[in-house]
A protein has these predicted regions:
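Extracytoplasmic beta-strand/coil segments of soluble accessory domains associated
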Residues: 34, 71, 75-111, 115, ...
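Short acidic/polar hinge/loop motifs at secondary-structure boundaries
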Residues: 111-138
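Periplasmic-side early beta-strands and strand-to-turn transitions of outer-membrane beta-barrels
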Residues: 142-143, 155, 162-164, 168-172, ...
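Repeated loop/turn-to-beta-strand initiation elements of outer-membrane beta-barrel proteins
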Residues: 191-194, 244-247, 257, 288-296, ...
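Outer-membrane beta-barrel domain signature, strongest for Gram-negative TonB-dependent receptors
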Residues: 221-338, 342-347, 458-459
Length: 627
C-alpha cells in the first residue's frame, strides 16, 4: 500500500502504523534508563513520567537525520507541521496541533527569542550545529510559561562542554552551492566547564517564488536564485563554587543575510534582509537546603532585521526582551515536589519603514506555582500562573493532569488546561491597523491518552481538543486588528520510539480536524496550511562502522490563499511524500563521513502557495567529534 493511498485513508495509516509497532516475534525488552527532561514541569523528570505529551530530539537524532536546519528537524516530530516561503533562511512557520504559528513558544536555553512585533520566532535562523537537544511539549502550557504557549513549547538547549577539553568540527558540501562548517572547543577543567562553538552556512538557493504560478507572478517576480548565508557563535562557562552553588554565563548569536522574492514587484527587483537573533544569560543555581533548590536567572534577547529594496534601506524591526526569573523547587517528600516562581519581563520594540515608525514598550510581572507528585499508582500535576501586562491587565491560566499506572508499563493520562496569547505590538499599535484595546487570545484544551513504556520502547496515543476564542484577525473597513475569530482543533496523535530486530524506529501520526468557527469566507472551514493527516517514519540501522537511515514524511492536502489574487481566492496544496536517505561511516571513534540524499524521489510540492521548495539534493559531510 503506497503512502499516498494511506494518506487518503487516515484510518488505514493508523492501522498500518500499529501493525508495524506491534508485529509478532518482537524481541525481548531491554532495560534502559529513561531520558530526563525539564520543559514539561520546569524541573527534572524522566520522560516516561511526564503527563504532558513530550518528545526529545537528541544530538544523536540530529546526526541521524542530517537535517540542515531547524524547520527540517522539527518536521520529523509528532504534531508539528512546517510552512516556509522558499529555501533555507526564508520565513518559516510552525503549526503545533493545528494552532497558529504564533501559538508555539520557542525557548533557547530557557530564554524567549520571539519577536514581540510579529509574535512568531525566526526559527529558520537557528543552526543545528550548536544545538545539543530539543524538547517539545505539546498542548496548552501557559500555566508554566505564559503567553504563546497555547499549542506548546519547543525548547532548544545549546551545546556545552564536559570531560577533557577537546576540539571538534565538521564540514558539509552539497547541492545548490551549499557549504557549511562548524568548529568547537570545550571541556571541563577542575570545577569549571566551558564551551565555544562557531558555525557558518551558505547556499546559493533557488528562486523563492515560482514565476510561472500565474500571469501576475511572471510580470512581478525576479527569477534569480535567492541565496542565504549565516554565521553563529555559541559560548558558555559555568563554575561549581561548591557542591551546593553554581554560577554560569551563556551567549548565543546568529546573523544572516537572505535574498527573497515579492509577488508585487518587478523581475529585476532585489529584496534582501539582514537579520540577527541573540541571547545572553547569567544564572546562579543554589541548594539553599537539602530539599530546596533555587535558581536566579537574568536573560536578555534581541531579534532584529533590516530590509533593503534594490540595495537601499527599506525597513528596520528590533525586539528587545529582558527577563529576571526566580524559580524554587522544594521536595516535600520523595515523590512530591512544589514549584514556586516569579518573573519580570520587559519588552521593547522598534519598527521603522519608509512610511511609518513606532516604538512600543510594556512590562509583564508573573507569579507561578506548581505541584507534581504520585500516590501509589496515581500521578498528579497542577500548575497555576498569573500574568499582569501593563497594556491590557491581568490574565490567569492553569494546567491540571492526572495519570494512573495500570501496570509498570501501561498508564492512562487525562488533562485539562487554559492558555493565552498576548496581543503583539503590531496588533496593538501598528499605524492604521492596531487596536490598543485588544484582549489576549484564549484557549481551553482537554486531552486523554495511554502510554506504553517498556525498556527501549515508548508509545503514546493522545486524543486532544483545543477551543480558541478571541483570535485576533483583520476585520472591518478600514481593516483593523479585532478579537472576533474562533477556531477548534480535534485530533488524535500517536508517536513511538523504540528498537525492533536491530532497527531504531521513530514514528508518529497525527489525525486532526483544524477548523475555523464559523468557516472562513475565503478558505472555508479548514485552517490555512494545516493538514488533516500527516506523519513521519524514521528507520535507522547500525552495521559495523556504518549507520544507515531512511526518513519518510507524508501529509495530505491543505488549503491556502492565492498570493496575487484580489480579492483573495482559495487554492489547494496537494498531498506529498518526502523521502530522505542517509549513511554515516565511522572511520575511527572520532572521525566520520556522512552522506545524505534529500527529497530522494524529487517530489514536487508546496508548503505555501506559489513558493518553491527544494528539489532532490546530495550532501556530503566530513566530521571530527572526540568521544
Amino acid at each position: 500500500m503506497s503512502c499516498r493511498i494511506l494518506l487518503r485513508r487516515p484510518r488505514a495509516l493508523a492501522v498500518s502504523l500499529f501493525a508495524l509497532i506491534f508485529t509478532s516475534g518482537a524481541p525481548s525488552i531491554a532495560q534502559q534508563i529513561p531520558q530526563v527532561v525539564v520543559t514539561a514541569t520546569r524541573s527534572e523528570q524522566a520522560i516516561t513520567d511526564t503527563l504532558a505529551s513530550t518528545t526529545v530530539l537528541t544530538r544523536e537524532d540530529i546526526r541521524d537525520t542530517q537535517a540542515t536546519d531547524l524547520p527540517t528537524l522539527l518536521r520529523s516530530a509528532a504534531g508539528i507541521e512546517v510552512a516556509q516561503n522558499g529555501g533555507p533562511g526564508t520565513a518559516a512557520s510552525v503549526f503545533m496541533r493545528g494552532g497558529n504559528s504564533s501559538h508555539t513558544l520557542i525557548l533557547l536555553d530557557g530564554v524567549r527569542i520571539n519577536s514581540s512585533t510579529l509574535g512568531a520566532t525566526a526559527l529558520e535562523r537557528l543552526t543545528l550545529e550548536q544545538i545539543e537537544r530539543v524538547e517539545i511539549v505539546r498542548g496548552n502550557v501557559s500555566a508554566l510559561y505564559g503567553s504563546e504557549a497555547i499549542g506548546g513549547v519547543i525548547q532548544l538547549f545549546t551545546r556545552q562542554g564536559g570531560g577533557a577539553p577537546a576540539l571538534g568540527g565538521s564540514l558539509t558540501t552539497g547541492s545548490r552551492g551549499t557549504l557549511s562548517g562548524n568548529l568547537d572547543y570545550g571541556g571541563k577543567v577542575g570545577d569549571t566547564r566551558f564551551y565555544i562553538g562557531l558555525a557558518g552556512f551558505h547556499t546559493s538557493g533557488f528562486s523563492a517564488i515560482n514565476p510561472d504560478t500565474n500571469a501576475a507572478t511572471r510580470a512581478a517576480v525576479n527569477p534569480d536564485n535567492d541565496g542565504y548565508r549565516n554565521t553563529t557563535v555559541n559560548a558558555n562557562v559555568s563554575h561549581l563554587i561548591n557542591p551546593r552553588n553554581e554560577v554560569g554565563l551563556r551567549l548565543y548569536e546568529t546573523r544572516g543575510l537572505v535574498n527573497f522574492d515579492s509577488a508585487f514587484a518587478t523581475p529585476t527587483t532585489a529584496h534582501q534582509t539582514r537579520n540577527s537573533t541573540s541571547s545572553f544569560t547569567a544564572y546562579s543555581k543554589n541548594r539553599i537546603l537539602d530539599a530546596w533548590r533555587s535558581t536566579l536567572t537574568f536573560s536578555k534577547s534581541v531579534d532584529s532585521s533590516d530590509q533593503t529594496l534594490n540595495f537601499k534601506w527599506d525597513g528596520h524591526i528590533r525586539t528587545d526582551q529582558r527577563q529576571l526569573t526566580w524559580q524554587n523547587e522544594i521536595a516535600l517528600a520523595p515523590t512530591h515536589k512544589l514549584l514556586l516562581g516569579a518573573e519580570s519581563l520587559s519588552q521593547r520594540a522598534e519598527s521603522e519603514s519608509t512610511t511609518s515608525r513606532f516604538y512600543p514598550a510594556r512590562q509583564i510581572g508573573s507569579v507561578l506555582a506548581g505541584y507534581s507528585g504520585s500516590v501509589e499508582r496515581a500521578e498528579f500535576q497542577l500548575n497555576l500562573r498569573n500574568d499582569r501586562y501593563s497594556d491590557f491587565g491581568r490574565t490567569n491560566s492553569y494546567f491540571a493532569a492526572a495519570g494512573y499506572n495500570f501496570t509498570n508499563e501501561w498508564k492512562a493520562i487525562a488533562q485539562q488546561s487554559t492558555a493565552f496569547k498576548a496581543p503583539t505590538f503590531n496588533d496593538l499599535y501598528f499605524p492604521n491597523f492596531g487596536s490598543p484595546n485588544l484582549l489576549p487570545e484564549r484557549a481551553r484544551s482537554q486531552e486523554f491518552g495511554f502510554q506504553w513504556a517498556a525498556g527501549v520502547h515508548l508509545l503514546r496515543v493522545t486524543r486532544f481538543r483545543t477551543d480558541y476564542t478571541d483570535l485576533i484577525v483583520s476585520a472591518g473597513t478600514p481593516a483593523r486588528a479585532t478579537n472576533v475569530a474562533k477556531a477548534r482543533v480535534n485530533g488524535v496523535e500517536t508517536h513511538y520510539n523504540g528498537q525492533w530486530f536491530g532497527f531504531d524506529l521513530r514514528t508518529n501520526l497525527t489525525l486532526q480536524d483544524p477548523v475555523s468557527v464559523p468557516a472562513d469566507a475565503v478558505t472555508g472551514p479548514q485552517l490555512r496550511r494545516r493538514a488533516r493527516a500527516f506523519g513521519n517514519i524514521g528507520v535507522y540501522r547500525s552495521v559495523g562502522p556504518w549507520r544507515f537511515g531512511a526518513d519518510l514524511y507524508a501529509t495530505n492536502k491543505r488549503v491556502d490563499t492565492d498570493i496575487t489574487a484580489f480579492p483573495s481566492q482559495k487554492v489547494g496544496l496537494a498531498s506529498y511524500n518526502l523521502l530522505t536517505l542517509t549513511a554515516r561511516y565511522n572511520v575511527t571513534k572520532e572521525i566520520y563521513i556522512a552522506a545524505k540524499v534529500d527529497n530522494a524521489t524529487n517530489a514536487q510540492y508546496q508548503l505555501v502557495h506559489g513558493y518553491n521548495t527544494p528539489q532532490r539534493g546530495f550532501f556530503l559531510t566530513f566530521g571530527y567529534q572526540p568521544k
